[in-house]
Amino acid sequence: MCSPDRLCFYCYVYILVEFIEWFEGKYDNWAQASSNPTSFAHIFLTHQRTGEFSFHCEQRYSHEKEPYRSKDIVIVPKGDIILVQNPVNDLIFQKMGKVYRGVNKPGVMVKGAELVSRVELGPNYYVVIDGGIDKNGKQVWGSENGPFIFDKKDK
């Protein structure tokens, strides 16, 4: 019998396959950007599978041809968590009900502040908020208007 801290083999495989299927694809935040253009740029996000557990990820503004961020990541299953190994900082995902929620490993400095990332992955969406927090607990960079909400367009 499975429990949250001890998955049987079948549940383990199911969760891993589901996560990869949901993660892979093309996303954009058109609905969010068009309803609030002064707060959110229109961004395309791509998670393109390059191997069994590897992806090439890109982010680009809709008005640009070239991405402003490009990276290769690897998905590593570790018991009841899924580790997304990222060149800057790994994300740790866990299935929570009907979604996967992820947070970054603490202690990583970016632009002179500690990186704080939170992500939610559903079957047709990807929500992310990143920010830099200084030693006084003040946000010094990142979205001031809430998370970016990406809708999945295709696989």
Please report, for each region that a protein language model flagged, where it lies by residue.
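Short secondary-structure subsegments characteristic of cysteine-rich extracellular domains
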Residues: 40-51
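Extreme N-terminal tail/first-helix region
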Residues: 11-18
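Calycin-type beta-barrel ligand-binding domains and close structural analogs
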Residues: 2, 18-24, 30-35, 50, ...
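Extracellular beta-rich globular recognition domains, centered on the fibrinogen C-terminal
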Residues: 54-59
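Cysteine-centered motifs
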Residues: 2, 8-11
